[in-house]
From Swiss-Prot:
Its EC number is 2.5.1.46. GO terms for molecular function: deoxyhypusine synthase activity. Its cofactor is NAD(+). The keyword Transferase applies. Pathway: Protein modification; eIF5A hypusination. It catalyses: [eIF5A protein]-L-lysine + spermidine = [eIF5A protein]-deoxyhypusine + propane-1,3-diamine. HAMAP family: DHS. It comes from Metallosphaera sedula (strain ATCC 51363 / DSM 5348 / JCM 9185 / NBRC 15509 / TH2). Belongs to the deoxyhypusine synthase family. This is Probable deoxyhypusine synthase. The keyword NADP does not apply.
Length: 310
């Protein structure tokens, strides 16, 4: 390491005028220190994913779909920024519930959960969900939409079934609707883990429905193997993160990766693992452009998204 190689670009002080006249991302680049640099660098990589990659993954966890970010996810899909979605079963629950009239409310982390249970209100962080606006909404939607589909054919892949549900949704903020409109596959490897999957199972007892998860695997396999450049925005951890990077090992790894997370790597968890660990598994290429942003997605994702529309 030589001083002249690393002491190249100085940190810049910012002023109130900068906050009024510059883009927030450019302000972060001037600040540079600590998390500001990772958000700026992540935004630059995200722009390259959208402009250069023919395969563009976004993976995220269901809790975010209970917030106002749901509409942002739908809009990014509708505008074609991403053409492959990997998520969890709860995403489908929240999207269906809210699409068919379910109301989610602003609350507090500090509310008494014992008292909320007495008045039939779920708490998801500081989001409040009346009992009747969640499980019942999903159950009614499945009971109404699924039987005619099973009469057409008994065996369905998950992504095709979700397109059919999206086709019957009129809410412009719906992720399922946006995916249907753009033929964007939504891959849900843990589809049975939630209200939607449970109701599919119940309906299968009466309708003969069969879910073919291997067809979803075939689709993601074909997309990965045929891609020339692949990038991913991975928000949160768990099965959606792992399924995304897992399949990309078969093309020698992602070319671009942006992790947005609050998980830490000290416990050896998949959720906390950084991109450098994925390199050892061949899931991200050694020369890939990558960034880790340690932040709550409700704070950082809207800022990152501005880089796509600026």
């Amino acid at each position: 390491m030589r001083r002249e190689d690393i002491l190249v670009e100085e940190v810049q002080d910012i002023t109130l005028d900068d906050l009024r006249g510059s883009s927030l991302l450019e302000v972060y680049n001037k600040i540079y220190g600590f998390s500001a640099e990772s958000i700026y660098r992540g935004s630059r990589i995200l722009k390259r994913i959208v402009s250069e990659c023919d395969l563009r993954f976004i993976s995220f966890t269901a809790n975010l779909v209970s917030t106002g970010l749901r509409g942002l996810f739908a809009d990014m899909i509708r505008r074609g920024y991403f053409n492959m979605v990997v998520t969890t079963g709860g995403t489908i629950d929240h999207d269906i519930a809210r699409s068919f009239g379910g109301k989610y409310y602003k609350g507090s982390f500090e509310f008494s959960d014992e008292e909320l249970r007495k008045i039939n209100v779920h708490r998801l962080g500081n989001i409040l969900i009346p009992f009747e606006d969640y499980g019942g909404m999903v159950e009614n939607a499945v009971n109404r939409i699924l039987p005619p589909l099973v009469k057409e054919k008994r065996e369905w892949s998950v992504y095709e079934l979700l397109w059919e549900f999206g086709k019957r949704i009129e809410d412009k903020h719906s992720i399922l609707r946006a995916a249907y409109e753009t033929n964007t596959p939504i891959i849900v490897p843990g589809v049975v883990d939630g209200s939607f999957g449970t109701n599919l199972f119940i309906q299968s007892q009466f309708t003969g429905l069969r879910i073919n998860l291997f067809e979803d695997m075939r689709l993601i396999k074909d997309r990965v193997f045929s891609s020339k450049m692949a990038g991913a925005l991975l928000i949160g951890g768990g099965i959606s993160k792992h399924h995304t990077i897992w399949w990309n090992q078969f093309r020698d790894g992602l070319d671009y990766a942006v992790y947005l997370t609050t998980a830490q790597e000290f416990d050896g968890s998949l959720s906390g693992a950084r991109p450098r660990e994925a390199i050892s598994w061949n899931k991200i290429r050694e020369n890939a452009e990558q960034a880790v942003i340690y932040a709550d997605a409700t704070l950082a994702l809207p800022i990152l998204a501005t880089s796509l529309i600026s």
